[in-house]
A protein has these predicted regions:
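Transmembrane alpha-helices and their membrane-interface boundaries in multi-pass membrane transporters
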Residues: 380, 397-411, 432-452, 459-501, ...
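Helix-loop junctions and hydrophobic alpha-helical segments within the transmembrane domains
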Residues: 322, 329, 333, 408, ...
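Extracytoplasmic/periplasmic membrane-proximal domains and adjacent transmembrane bundles
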Residues: 6, 119, 165-345, 408, ...
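Hydrophobic transmembrane alpha-helices and their membrane-interface caps
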Residues: 24-31, 345-413, 871-958, 963-982, ...
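Solvent-exposed, membrane-proximal periplasmic/extracellular interface segments of envelope transport
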Residues: 22, 58-134, 192-213, 232-234, ...
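Solvent-exposed, non-transmembrane alpha-helical starts
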Residues: 16, 55-62, 99-110, 140-144, ...
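Transmembrane helices with small-residue packing motifs
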Residues: 12, 19-54, 116-123, 450-459, ...
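Signature of alpha-helical transmembrane segments and their immediate interfacial
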Residues: 1-34, 430-432, 500-551, 596, ...
């Protein structure tokens, strides 16, 4: 008993299968997790080390170099990039793509152990060594707290209260606060007063530094009981600090700290990072979601919790959403579900009109059940509903009906020939089940490189393959089981759907016209082939005019403005300038909100957002508009106005993008040892970019050289006075800004103690040599000019960038996002000119940016592509037990580029990475249709028919299933044409498949006749 006969006769089992698919599909759809975009693992960690007082060169040589050397010993490392600046080393470590998210924690632990083992050998002045391995955490809910009448301490207190409540919500991963300013105790010590009392500042500094150190005092056994010893004297109030006793040197009197110092409580004066939201100082609360949760449901819980806490919110504090991933996901998924429903409706309507009511209902029901079954498998394998998985379903829709169309078509033909329903169903399923399986596996295999790619782009797009795999395989199962069952229920024997003539179902005018055209093509077979080759050559030439793109801009109406002040600018000056720029942007029309992050980037609120490192001269504005159309209008206005309005900073305007994307579209990396040579080469590269009218935001990552003040230390004089270089440095630090010495523990809060001179005694550059410094030899203060032989002004490299342990200066640029130009076009124009530059020995130029990202993504695909195509060819050989016959349909695969090239040019769509995936998938669709036709030719030949007539009759009999399969796929793509992410892929598949239908129905028969030497029948 065949599977079709079994399905028809065992109606209870078939109905049970339908009920399981329907109920299970609906239930699974409701249970599926929801995301805006699929998760992909950011395989990066950051090592941050501080080395106060060290120059960028000293940081590079004494701190960055040994850290990089030790990290590089790990076998998992892909690349290491670092930034060495004054007193700070920032090292980004990227893992190889071979390692998945489950392996990363162990790798980070191993790296942490290596760095900890190295720490004792690092310079003594290295104060902190931090390893951030949650660099890829995404804070999908970002809240901004503002309040005109509240200071940072009060805002932070309320933020802490909210954090404690939000952390308890089911589905919340972690909650972090950013933008808060450290509260400090300022101890202002009068140097004049110390000199009068003959007190050494270092004595006070030492006391403050040691008084609150937590040190074990041991334990003692008392009557068999072990008691801990806890000496009192810990400073935990300002009063206790004021009453700290200092021993006077000359008089022997006990002097309290308040006798020589004024102690106040306040906010750090030089912040690391400041946030603004709509012009107000802000604190950010970032909430990340736990893995695998339904983001929309957790977002609703967060909203409900915040609403319940509204009553305890202090009056005057405002809380606003900066980013609400739950809402974004809900909107995105709803839009895609609507697109999916539209696509299903389009396919079913087409089937009803072209196949007849009953046939259309059968295939439509099978399509819906296949989609429901796909939801069940997605739920089982933890594939969430998001842009990629839903897009995959829409892409698959047209292909999902292919197998069912072939089966229904065969049943209809059998009925026209007088067979019973069960005979017709059994015959067609027996005849086509294995060719259809082979064709389905080939279609799935065409998408396999996406699923097997291990780079970030492959991980991002991977669910596309798995959803297509599930749905296409299910479409084969339902085609050979449920389709015969439903046909037996709904079709009538002796059905007249196909034609009025029962003896020949292909007497219709469409079939007759096609048959005549095919006979002409077979008669002039070499002219037909020559014409196709000419079209292919023309398409390849035309493809050079198609715009190239990696990933398109996001649908979210948000963009970024990066502002760079001249290097060396104090962050307080950057704050002042950022406030003016933020106010200017906020005055523009159609603004939803403007936020600013000064000193570094925001917390990562989306996977594709790359936070900037710490730079005092940097600020980023995040601008959200009312809709996407007005965003581009505003971008155009700001692009022309910002530079004219503000002369000090430079600006870079960036759009949010789908998928992983580089910081800049064009990156020319210049590697070599000498900074001066690197800068000279950078000037030449920048000159080339400046000559191209399409280049924007041209700069390099070493920034401008900065000035430094160099007191010339006389070591011999200083030694006689008992003064070291460290004494001079600490005294100057105290005189100009102050030093953090010690901590005061106030409950759970730890307040750093900042020791500095009163404002009236702080010196400026001109009076540097008059700074008073304590001489241990003289036991008194002396002016610094006794140990300094003048002061000079020098230049230094503020930032030393390295890549894989080599100094690397990167020239950065972007294309004009408001024009028709693309990054790939700009790269194609400037790359040959840059590579033609004379490069000194020991230096090289390599390329990053979008070029590298695209190349890496394509290499990830091409790694498995040869094996995939080999498997596809082997399957076609096994299906036909021949080597020559598969060549017939494989010849048509490269010809699909004809439709793709002219389709993209006609619609002015770019050839993006998604379009590239669409091009790969076309091969599977073309082969699938070709197999159906070639299998029919074999059947006709096996029945003893004349070869020439067998070719014509087979092609005519396959016109409807092949053209219907193509038509449903093409029309089902319509909702994706208007999607920013899938638009170019949709056009690629629609245009390519439309032309491929001609290839299948005309070129395959012609090539078969040529390869097998078949001539027209003499009759």
């Amino acid at each position: 008993m065949s599977i079709a006969e079994y399905s028809i006769k065992n109606k209870v089992i078939s109905w049970l299968f339908i009920v399981i698919l329907a109920i299970g599909g609906v239930t699974s759809f409701l249970e599926l997790g929801r995301l805006e975009d699929p998760a992909f693992t950011i395989k990066d960690a950051m090592v941050i080390a501080t080395y106060p007082g060290a120059t960028s060169k000293e940081v590079e040589e004494e701190l960055t170099y040994p850290l990089e050397k030790e990290i590089r010993k790990l076998p998992y490392i892909d690349k290491i990039t670092s930034t060495s600046s004054n007193g700070l080393s920032q090292i980004m470590v990227s893992m190889k793509m071979d390692y998945g998210p489950d392996e990363l924690p162990q790798i980070w632990d191993e790296m942490r152990r290596k760095i900890n083992d190295l720490q004792p050998s690092l310079p003594q002045g290295v104060q902190s060594l931090q390893i951030i391995d949650d660099f890829g955490d995404v804070y999908g809910v970002m809240l901004m707290l503002t309040g005109d009448d509240y200071n940072y301490v009060e805002l932070k207190r309320y933020a802490d209260q909210l954090t404690r409540e939000l952390e308890l919500i089911d589905g919340v991963g972690k909650v972090d606060i950013a933008g808060d300013q450290q509260e400090q105790l300022f101890v202002e010590i009068s140097l004049d007063r110390l000199a009068a009392l003959n007190l050494d500042m270092n004595v006070i500094s030492g006391l403050l530094n040691k008084q609150n150190n937590v040190v074990s005092a041991g334990e003692v056994m008392v009557n068999g009981e072990s008691l801990m010893i806890r000496p009192s004297g810990t400073l935990n109030t300002v009063d206790a600090l004021e009453n700290l006793i200092i021993h006077g040197r000359d008089t022997g009197n006990l002097i309290r700290l308040k006798d020589v110092a004024t102690i106040t409580r306040g906010i750090q004066e030089k912040p690391d990072n400041v946030l603004l939201f709509n012009g107000k100082k802000a604190i950010n609360i970032g909430v990340s979601f736990a893995s695998g949760v339904n983001v929309v449901e957790v977002g609703q819980r967060i909203e409900a919790e915040l609403a319940s806490l509204e009553s305890i919110k202090p009056a005057g504090i405002d809380m606003s959403y900066f980013y609400n991933q739950a809402q974004e996901v809900d909107d995105s998924v709803k839009a895609f579900v609507i697109s999916l429903a539209e696509a299903v409706a389009i396919v079913i309507i087409v089937l009803l009109f072209t196949m007849g009511l009953r046939s259309g209902v059968i295939i439509g029901l099978v399509l819906l059940l296949t989609v429901f079954g796909t939801f069940i498998l997605m739920n089982h394998y933890d594939i969430e509903l998001h842009r990629i998985s839903l897009g995959a379903l829409i892409i698959a829709l047209g292909m999902l009906v292919d197998n069912a169309i072939v089966v229904v078509e065969g049943i209809l033909v059998g009925l026209k020939k007088g067979r019973t329903k069960i005979q017709a169903a059994t015959d067609i399923v027996k005849q086509t089940q294995w060719p259809l399986l082979g064709a389905t596996v080939i279609a799935i295999t065409a998408f396999a490189p996406i699923g097997l790619s291990q780079d970030a782009t492959g991980e991002f797009m991977g669910s596309l393959f798995w959803v297509l795999c599930f749905s296409l395989f299910l479409s084969w199962i339902t085609a050979i089981t449920l389709t015969p069952f439903l046909a037996d229920l709904l079709l009538k024997e002796q059905d007249k759907t196909l034609a009025a003539d029962e003896e020949d179902p292909y007497k219709g005018w469409l079939f007759v016209a096609f048959g005549a055209s095919l006979k002409w093509a077979l008669r002039f077979r070499w002219l037909t082939v020559t014409g196709m080759v000419a079209l292919l050559v023309g398409a390849v030439v035309a493809f050079g005019n198609v715009k190239q793109q990696f990933f398109p801009p996001s649908n979210t109406p948000m963009f970024y403005v990066d502002m760079w002040m001249p290097e060396g600018t104090d962050i307080r000056e950057t704050m002042k300038q950022a406030g003016e720029v933020e106010s200017y942007i906020r005055q523009q029309a159609n603004i939803d909100f403007v936020s600013a992050s000064i000193g570094q980037g925001l917390q990562r609120f989306a996977l594709t957002y790359e936070p900037a490192k710490n730079y005092e001269a940097y600020a980023q504005f995040q601008v959200r508009t009312t809709d996407r159309d007005t965003m581009f209008v505003l971008l155009n206005e700001l692009d022309s106005r910002l530079a004219k309005t503000f002369d000090k900073p430079t600006f870079q305007l960036k759009l949010m993008e789908f998928g992983p994307s580089p910081a800049s579209k064009i990156e020319a990396r210049i590697t070599g040892p000498d900074p001066q040579v690197l800068r000279a080469l950078a000037v030449q590269v920048e000159d080339i970019l400046h000559t191209d009218p399409g280049a924007r935001n041209i700069r390099h990552d070493w920034r401008e050289r900065t000035k430094q003040i160099v007191p010339i230390f006389n070591e011999s004089k200083a030694r006689r006075l008992g003064i070291s270089k460290e004494d001079l440095s600490s005294t100057l630090q105290m005189s100009f800004g102050g030093s953090t010495l010690g901590l005061l523990r106030d409950g759970t809060h730890i307040l750093p103690i900042m020791v500095r001179l009163p404002e009236t005694e702080r010196v400026d550059f001109e009076s540097l040599q008059n700074v008073s410094i304590w001489s241990p030899s003289l036991q008194s203060y002396i002016p610094a000019d006794q140990i300094i032989d003048g002061v000079t002004l020098d230049w230094e490299e503020p930032l030393i960038q390295r890549r894989d342990r080599k100094r690397t200066l990167t020239v950065l640029a972007d294309h004009d996002v408001l024009s028709e130009d693309t990054a790939a076009s700009l790269f194609a124009r400037v790359q040959p000119k840059v590579m033609a530059l004379p490069i000194p020995h020991g230096y090289e130029i390599t390329w990053g940016g979008e070029y590298e990202s695209s190349k890496d993504a394509q290499e990830g695909l091409f790694g498995s592509l040869p094996m995939g195509y080999l498997l596809m060819f082997i399957i076609t050989m096994l299906l036909f037990n021949s080597f020559k016959k598969p060549l017939v349909i494989w010849f048509t695969v490269p010809l699909s580029i004809i439709g793709v090239a002219f389709g993209l040019l006609a619609t002015n769509m770019p050839f993006s990475f998604t379009a590239f995936l669409g091009l790969l998938s076309l091969s599977g669709m073309i082969l699938k249709n070709g197999i159906v036709l070639l299998d029919q030719i074999n059947l006709e030949l096996d029945s003893g028919k004349d070869p020439y007539l067998a070719i014509i009759d087979s092609a005519v009999s396959r016109v409807r299933p092949v053209s219907m399969a193509a038509l449903t796929t093409i029309l089902g793509m319509i909702p994706l044409v208007f999607d920013a992410f899938f638009g170019s892929m949709a056009i690629t598949i629609m245009a390519g498949l439309g032309f491929a239908t001609v290839l299948t129905l005309v070129v395959v028969p012609v090539m078969f006749a040529i390869l097998f030497g078949i001539k027209p029948a003499k009759s």
